[in-house]
UniProtKB/Swiss-Prot annotation:
GO molecular function: aspartic-type endopeptidase activity
Function comment: Probable aspartic protease. Seems to act as a proteasomal shuttle which links the proteasome and replication fork proteins like RTF2. Required, with DDI2, for cellular survival following replication stress. Together or redudantly with DDI2, removes RTF2 from stalled forks to allow cell cycle progression after replication stress and maintains genome integrity.
Domain Ubiquitin-like: 1-81
Native organism: Homo sapiens
Stored PANTHER family: DNA DAMAGE INDUCIBLE 1 HOMOLOG 2 (PTHR15397:SF3), SODIUM-GLUCOSE COTRANSPORTER REGULATORY PROTEIN -RELATED (PTHR15397)
Gene3D superfamilies xref list: Acid Proteases, Phosphatidylinositol 3-kinase Catalytic Subunit, Chain A, domain 1
Name of the gene this protein is made from: DDI1
Name under which the protein is recorded: Protein DDI1 homolog 1
Length: 396
């Protein structure tokens, strides 16, 4: 029969594997096979099936009610006692001996026990920076140490701001007490989620509610993994792009027009039409409602006007909107009429009927309503610098 094992190690790392065994296979031998797959020592393995802990090692799996296709949970016990010297199977091979811990000298020789105690703290710092919430309250390193390690590493600090904003905000507040409170609260939440997840995995496989929750958890894990991969492989997808604007003139008045090939018609705001002195030409029989992301009331239509782009004077019609933040939008009707093409490689709008090219405006020249939110990044950088300097003064 095929048994699927869902393994949760002491450090809350997970692994899933399947074992082909017979119903008369003893539990102790099953644990030996699990040790080879999970790298968890036999004496630290706990097997749970249907919310029941399997205790008698000499009993067969069939006597416990296991059958083909069943799922069991493997939990690693806490430290069961002193182990022989040497590397534990799941001990990380990363050497953190070269890390200078705040308050100590990196040149001073370290006792092996001290080095092993520092390693989890360094791992927690890396986990926090990658957006991961620390898993359990037991084995928590000093919040002051974690805070100092994050403040001393700009890369980890930037990752923390992206993936764990509440903790980053507490870190940059300059208050160790606030940072400790947020850290402990996130740990409690993570511990509760882990308990709920273990309860679901050990529940009755035929329980529809439990299966629905497991399905939702798997979906959320896939979403989180997809986002993390995108952050690593395509970080530019999380940035904002500058919209396409060009300089033009209507009735001699300079304007900044938004080029939108997805808009059906060319529109102009009522305020802009009044500045350009073309409100007298508005045909109110064409009043209506423009629908898109929202709705806007159309006052009417200017059937024919001239728009100047560079040295070209082009015929154009405008639908006048009552309450529109941008002055003018060049829609597909105007772009098609004059065979315009958007060349993003050269960053120009090409007028097909005349061959004239006009450059798209940089962000600094865009109307205020279309500029990206600025100033936040600069203030955040100042906060980081202030926190690092403040932390350095406190340590010295």
């Amino acid at each position: 029969m095929l048994i699927t094992v869902y393994c949760v190690r002491r450090d809350l790392s997970e692994v899933t594997f399947s074992l082909q065994v017979s119903p008369d296979f003893e539990l102790r031998n099953f644990k030996v096979l699990c040790e080879a797959e999970s790298r968890v020592p036999v004496e630290e393995i706990q097997i749970i099936h249907m919310e029941r802990l399997l205790i008698e090692d000499h009993c067969s799996l069939g006597s416990y009610g296991l059958k083909d296709g069943d799922i069991v949970v493997l939990l690693q016990k806490d430290n069961v006692g002193p182990r022989a010297p040497g590397r534990a199977p799941n001990q990380p091979r990363v050497d953190f001996s070269g890390i200078a811990v705040p308050g100590t000298s990196s040149s001073r020789p370290q006792h092996p026990g001290q080095q092993q105690q520092r390693t989890p703290a360094a791992q927690r710092s890396q986990g926090l920076a990658s957006g991961e919430k620390v898993a359990g309250l037991q084995g928590l390193g000093s919040p002051a140490l974690i805070r100092s390690m994050l403040l001393s590493n700009p890369h980890d600090l930037s990752l923390l701001k992206e993936r764990n904003p509440p903790l980053a905000e507490a870190l940059l507040s300059g208050s160790l007490e606030t940072f400790s409170q947020v850290l402990m609260e996130q740990q409690r939440e993570k511990a509760l989620r882990e308990q709920e997840r273990l309860r679901l995995y050990t529940a009755d496989p035929l329980d529809r509610e439990a299966q629905a929750k497991i399905e939702e958890e798997i979906r959320q894990q896939n979403i989180e993994e997809n986002m993390n991969i995108a952050i690593e492989e395509a970080p530019e997808s999380f940035g904002q792009v500058t919209m396409l604007y060009i300089n033009c003139k209507v009735n001699g008045h300079p304007l900044k027009a938004f080029v939108d090939s997805g808009a059906q018609m060319t529109i102009m705001s009522q305020a802009c039409a009044e500045r350009c002195n073309i409100m007298r030409l508005v045909d109110r029989r064409w009043a209506g409602v423009a629908k898109g992301v929202g709705t806007q009331r159309i006052i009417g239509r200017v059937h024919l006007a001239q728009i100047q782009i560079e040295g070209d004077f082009l015929q154009c019609s405008f639908s006048i909107l009552e309450d529109q933040p941008m002055d003018m939008l060049l829609g597909l009707d105007m772009l098609r009429r004059h065979q315009c093409s958007i060349d993003l490689k050269k960053n120009v709008l090409v007028i097909g009927t005349t061959g004239t090219q006009t450059y798209f405006l940089p962000e600094g020249e865009l109307p205020l309503c279309s500029r990206m939110v600025s100033g936040q990044d600069e203030s955040s950088d100042k906060e980081i610098t202030h926190s690092v300097m403040d932390s350095g003064r406190k340590e010295h």
